[in-house]
Amino acid sequence: MLFRSLHQKYKGKITTALRDNGEIDRDKLSSYYSPGVGAVSQAIAENPADLPKYTWTNNLVGVISDGSAILGLGNLGPKAAMPVMEGKALLFKHFANVDAVPIVLDVHEPKEIKIGRAHV
């Protein structure tokens, strides 16, 4: 069955990729992570409005589900929701070039979902 074989072949539909297509040498690695990234964090702390200037947050969404209503199949749970959330993330990237991260929650009551203030 083509539906299952594609999912099994690729072990999911999405991945993250580096924007820097060049070789990541020691100097770049030190800049992208530690210690160089500290300067970027300090710049954002000084001016939070600069967050999109330095990070992917200007082109990022979360695709979130608890698996309680999967494509008309009903409540199949969060694990069964993951391929659907990946598919939605794929659509965001393919049609709008928006990076999307699938997130499934193992809670079903709104009161169980404790979301703090968004920082992005």
Predicted regions and their residues:
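Short, small-residue-biased leader/transition segments that mark boundaries at the very start
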Residues: M1-L2, H119
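Solvent-exposed alpha-helices and their adjacent loops that cap or buttress functional pockets
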Residues: Q8, L51-T57, I64, K93-H94
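An N-terminal-biased, well-structured beta-alpha scaffold segment characteristic
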Residues: E46-K53, H94, V98-R117
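Glycine- and acidic-residue-enriched helix-capping/strand-helix junction motifs
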Residues: L71-M85
